[in-house]
Amino acid sequence: MCAVLDRSMLSVAEISDRLEIQQLLVDYSSAIDQRRFDDLDRVFTPDAYIDYRALGGIDGRYPKIKQWLSQVLGNFPVYAHMLGNFSVRVDGDTASSRVICFNPMVFAGDRQQVLFCGLWYDDDFVRTPDGWRIIRRVETKCFQKMM
């Protein structure tokens, strides 16, 4: 029996690229949730543009955003970033993705209010000598609800 090559099948390289990018997105969430902000240096390019304005944040280049994250997230003793619906498109040494994030954030204080955020991460990536890195990230708001 002859095997017929299905042209719609992903190559091993394409599968590897997609898995590496998916892991990079998980690495972002882990770095944020564990407050290991220096780990973000292995997620973003040094000149990456990041736009968090859709949910009340700021936009700018990675160094500015990294500093802002380490300051503003101190207002929340507990938070978590849960990712899903990974849609990754690879084109040679560049790629893009759209991933949904569910992000509950507990405010400090006696009332323990929780801000539930639903958002999309729309990202562009570039392959570097050290692996894939995010070169552009824009948040798109789905919902925010305080409880």
From Swiss-Prot:
Further comment found in the protein's record: Was identified as a high-confidence drug target.
Protein name (database record): Uncharacterized protein Rv2910c
